[in-house]
């Protein structure tokens, strides 16, 4: 079962049994395939929205490409072709993803209408953080945990070049796309800030106590 089939099946169950409270755990969600965050969010809203203000590329070619996992001629050619096919140089000098490639998922008339709780942490990044920003911006949810690692207004992720330093052989992941979200409710330079901050502790870890989940369940019981 793929992600979208799994998501559909989950919300079908929520609808069938008239579930009123939903907890979504995003604490270790570092992202994944672009568009999955849209698909999940489409089940949480019945209103149209704009996801990205823009997706920006710094350049079409990179001077360090021969030290990355795209060093072979075939990989390099394929990467550069993809970058030029998907992006365009604007009059302002910025390289922006072509507008026709923006395809947010359509909102659903039968979206979840109950109480929503989102668990977050510093490991919530990329598509995971984008999902949290969309929920904060367009839905009514309670966030519990720590501030997301990914920024409220966007992040650098997407296509990643794995650079190997020539002397030390240390490997560094370099994301080359800047995702600028079409949002306005957050704080610049910060992630999604929880309504209830729950700080991790060695004691709760050793005792295997999930403080964030415990708090969410206590709020539901009120």
Residue map of PLM features:
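C-terminal "post-core" interaction segments
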Residues: 1-222
């Amino acid at each position: 079962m793929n992600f979208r089939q799994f998501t559909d099946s989950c919300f079908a169950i929520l609808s069938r049994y008239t579930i009123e409270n939903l907890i979504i755990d995003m604490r270790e969600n570092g992202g994944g395939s672009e568009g999955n965050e849209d698909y999940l969010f489409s089940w949480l809203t019945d209103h149209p929205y704009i996801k990205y203000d823009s997706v920006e590329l710094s350049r079409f070619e990179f001077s360090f490409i021969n030290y990355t996992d795209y060093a072979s001629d075939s990989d390099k050619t394929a990467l550069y072709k993809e970058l030029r096919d998907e992006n365009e140089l604007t009059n302002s000098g910025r390289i922006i993803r072509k507008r026709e490639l923006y395809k947010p998922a359509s909102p659903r008339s039968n979206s979840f209408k109950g109480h929503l709780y989102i668990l977050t942490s510093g490991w919530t990044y990329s598509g995971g953080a984008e999902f949290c920003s969309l929920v904060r911006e367009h839905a009514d949810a309670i966030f519990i945990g720590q501030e997301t690692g990914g920024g409220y207004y966007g992040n650098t992720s997407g296509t990643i070049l794995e650079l190997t330093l020539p002397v030390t052989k240390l490997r560094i992941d370099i994301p080359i796309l800047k995702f600028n979200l079409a949002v306005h409710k957050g704080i610049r330079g910060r992630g999604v800030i929880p309504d209830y901050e729950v700080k991790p502790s060695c004691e709760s870890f050793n005792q295997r106590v999930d403080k964030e989940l415990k708090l969410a369940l206590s709020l539901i019981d009120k």
